[in-house]
Amino acid sequence: MMQTNKTTANPLLEIAQRIREMREIVGYTTAEMAEKTEVSEQQYLQYEAGQADFPFTFMHKCALAFGVE
């Protein structure tokens, strides 16, 4: 039986962690990312923590902020 860790068992959390990693790599604060994705900082923090499911528009705006097309 294949073992799974907490991240792979929860794809939402895995994506949220990748968004956080990309934000840290490009050097944006959570406030800057909230502005770039047009959500409140509180909502952004919930998305980044994997505590709330995020819409496609949020993902698209993250990609644009990170320079990914």
Name each model-derived stretch.
Residues M2-I25:
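A short, Lys/Arg-rich alpha-helix, primarily the initiator
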Residues A16, A34-T37, A63:
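Small-residue (primarily alanine) positions within well-ordered alpha-helices
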Residues Q17, G27-Y28, F54-T57:
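Residue-level signal for the short linker/turn that defines the boundary of a DNA-recognition helix
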Residues M22-I25, G50, A65:
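Histidine kinase transmitter module recognition
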Residues V26-A49:
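Short alpha-helical DNA-recognition segment
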Residues T57-E69:
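DNA major-groove recognition helix of helix-turn-helix/homeodomain DNA-binding modules
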